[in-house]
A protein has these predicted regions:
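Acidic (Asp/Glu)-rich catalytic clusters
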Residues: 40-43, 70-77, 125-130, 213, ...
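N-terminal beta-rich core of secreted/periplasmic extracellular enzymes
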Residues: 25-38, 72-83, 89, 120
Length: 342
């Protein structure tokens, strides 16, 4: 094989034993799990707001950001359930660039997967301890989910991963909401097929075990826009797009029809400052169609302490080193506006 086997990684249980969570923290996570479950089952009318940096690059800045979210959550708790994005591993379009804290716990140092694995678990635990939030992360590497399974309340499967067999089958074995993004080319039938696979039981190999999943009734759609054959961004958050997804769900017979709409990526044409307008348009659509209102369970927004983005060695505290994000002032104002619209 054309690779070097550098070292054997500790098992998920070994890492959990080294960095455990208390019974109180476990119960806090369960409370968030129950609240999210109610939203995706339709027994709660609150909006799930999955919001945070494109990538969790620095522990101190991420913690400060999420502490600010906690204060806002208390003011909007009757209308919105905030689930912070703590994305610790990043897919890269060409494979180049910063791949997240899992790969590089220090963005300016060489990759160290063992240190990264420990760093991401410690970060999620610190967030839970200091804010009470259990968070969302992307399931980029399915077999790594078990390292964080006791601290995550939401998982997204990205546009480049959604057709992958192991991602789909692993999603079928989780007991939290899993959002399946439409692929970068925008084919919604691919996304619907992924949700179908995730909602059904399967037997497969996971972490050197033969496992039997039960199926995940909380698997759902994420609309993130698409790139057409010319490479141009095309949004899929408009009223007619949501109406089409309602029809696809009706035809599919899937459990608990639901969508979370990503306001950035191809939906914004990578113009991050458009996210507030897009988010408000989506909520207006929910008010004009009862069917769309039932379907839309949440929004996904990329936000950090500072507007925009910088290079990994840029040095601006709280500014994204991957995709550009909304800064805090715009974020806070937007959350209150969304609560008023809800």
């Amino acid at each position: 094989m054309n690779m070097e086997f550098k070292r054997k990684m500790p098992t998920p249980q070994a890492v959990k034993d080294m960095y455990p969570i208390s019974a109180d923290l476990a119960e806090q996570k369960k409370e968030t799990d129950r609240a999210l479950r109610d939203i995706f089952l339709g027994t709660s009318e609150r909006l799930a707001l999955i919001i945070g940096p494109c990538s969790a690059d620095r522990e101190d800045a991420v913690l400060e950001y999420i502490c600010r979210l906690r204060e806002v959550q208390e003011r909007v708790k009757d209308k919105i359930l905030i689930v912070p994005r703590v994305y610790t591993n990043k897919p890269r379009t060409t494979g180049d660039g910063y791949k997240g804290m899992l790969h590089q716990p220090d963005p300016n140092s060489s990759p160290d997967m063992l240190k990264g694995l420990i760093a991401i678990r410690k970060l999620h635990i610190r967030v839970l301890e200091q804010t009470g939030f259990s968070c969302a992360d992307e399931m980029l590497y399915p077999e790594n989910h078990h390292y964080l399974s006791d601290v995550l309340s939401y998982v997204a499967v990205g546009a480049r991963s959604v057709e992958n067999q192991l991602h789909r089958l692993t999603a079928s074995g989780l007991d939290i909401p899993v959002g399946m993004k439409n692929p970068t080319g925008g084919n919604l039938s691919v996304m619907i097929n992924s949700i179908t696979a995730a909602q059904h039981p399967h037997t497969f190999v996971y972490s050197s075990w033969e496992v039997q999943s039960k199926g995940n009734p909380l698997a759902h759609a994420i609309l993130r826009g698409l790139a057409n054959k010319h490479g141009r961004s095309v949004p899929n958050y408009h009223y007619e797009d949501l109406q089409l997804l309602c029809e696809l769900y009706d035809q599919s017979g899937l459990q608990n029809p639901a969508v979370v709409v990503d306001t950035n990526h191809s939906n914004s044409g990578k113009h991050w400052e458009e996210q507030p307008r897009i988010a408000k348009e989506i909520l207006h659509s929910t008010r004009h169609s009862a069917q769309i209102g039932r379907l839309v369970k949440g929004l996904m927004i990329e936000s950090y302490l500072e507007d925009g983005c910088q290079k990994p060695d840029g040095g601006v505290y709280g500014k994204s080193i991957t995709d550009p994000c909304l800064g805090w002032k715009k974020t806070e104002r937007l959350i209150y506006e969304l609560a008023d619209l809800r």
